[in-house]
Amino acid sequence: MSATLALTEQLIARASVTPDDQHCQQLMTERLAALGFECETIASHGVTNLWAVKRGADGRDGKLLAFAGHTDVVPTGPLEQWTSPPFVPTHRDGKLYGRGAADMKTSLAAFVVASEEFVAAHPGHRGAIAFLITSDEEGPATDGTVKVVELLETRGERVDYCIVGEPTSSAELGDVVKNGRRGSMSGELVVKGVQGHIAYPHLAKNPIHLLAPALAELAAEQWDAGNEYFPPTTWQVSNLHAGTGATNVIPGHADLMFNFRFSTASTVEGLQARVHAILGKHGLEYTLKWSVSGLPFLTPRGDLSNALENAIRAETGLTTELSTTGGTSDGRFIARICPQVIEFGPPNGSIHKIDEHIDVRFVDPLKNVYRRVLEQLIA
């Protein structure tokens, strides 16, 4: 069994359902400390974070390449629906099954072993390697990567390149990498009316009727046209509620929850202003609470994307696609301190599902791609 596969199995065997790390980071720290990494545990409200750095011959003047990832996994769902226990690494038909196999314990193991091989082959490497690992990516993400980034900001730590080990591939390892992500902003809208008997509408004020024209306009609005890297911004309703459940009562308020997934073609302030303008045009009496969970980020073509594309091509023969599709990731926090952030990991077809798995034939090639990137950028 390869070193990468063995470490992957050890990590899967630890039931690290968010935010419980279950000592996964301790296992990684033992391996990294043996290589000369300075390892720091940063705990926050039940979340475990790791910042580990190995400086190169150039010291703090050298380029720093960080790997960012998470040890936490989503809950298993009904255990009886799993073909094998989710925290017992199991091989069937050339695949390794277990919660976290694809998202993202294979990536964690692959970069640890890639670092071991790189340091052994290049003991005098010039640049620095770092690991930024959290147990709060699958949860609220309020005490994980964002806390470490804030700490690094206060220290003036410079990160030149960052690979996030999210499962970005589609059908084959390396066919897709993410060089950016859309931002995410949610709104909680309460439209006020006047409750009353449904037979006497002149004595009441129906907030559903008041909201409907504005809702139609918001749904039809083209917020932007996107750009060469991002599709157009989208606005979607996630929840709509009004009424008491009775059939003879006009409700006193209507509650709407919605979400923007927005590109670099729009801003938080611009989108908020346009929503308020539409609501105001319809004369609504309302309250609106905003929540921004992430800003869009984009890494243009540069040293990191070139190195990753070259490594994937050398290892797999594939020409990778740079993409910004999908949901948010911790890359949105890291982009605050790092100009080049790219996500790359194994295929994502089974993530968060019953019987999550990874094709074993991708495990060592993933490690090799990571090692090739290290060799190109910081050797």
From Swiss-Prot:
Organism superkingdom: Bacteria
Signal peptide: none
Entry binding sites for Zn(2+) 2: 103, 138, 352
Binding site for Zn(2+) 1: 70, 103, 166
Cofactor(s) in the UniProt record: Zn(2+); Co(2+)
Annotated cofactor note: Binds 2 Zn(2+) or Co(2+) ions per subunit.
Keyword set, alphabetical order: Amino-acid biosynthesis, Cobalt, Diaminopimelate biosynthesis, Hydrolase, Lysine biosynthesis, Metal-binding, Zinc
EC numbers, comma separated: 3.5.1.18
InterPro entries: ArgE/DapE_CS, Bact_exopeptidase_dim_dom, DapE_proteobac, Peptidase_M20, Peptidase_M20_dimer, Peptidase_M20A
Active-site residue numbers: 72, 137
Family label: Belongs to the peptidase M20A family. DapE subfamily.
Record's function text: Catalyzes the hydrolysis of N-succinyl-L,L-diaminopimelic acid (SDAP), forming succinate and LL-2,6-diaminopimelate (DAP), an intermediate involved in the bacterial biosynthesis of lysine and meso-diaminopimelic acid, an essential component of bacterial cell walls.
Family annotation (HAMAP family): DapE
Name of this chain's protein: Succinyl-diaminopimelate desuccinylase
Protein source organism: Burkholderia ambifaria (strain ATCC BAA-244 / DSM 16087 / CCUG 44356 / LMG 19182 / AMMD)
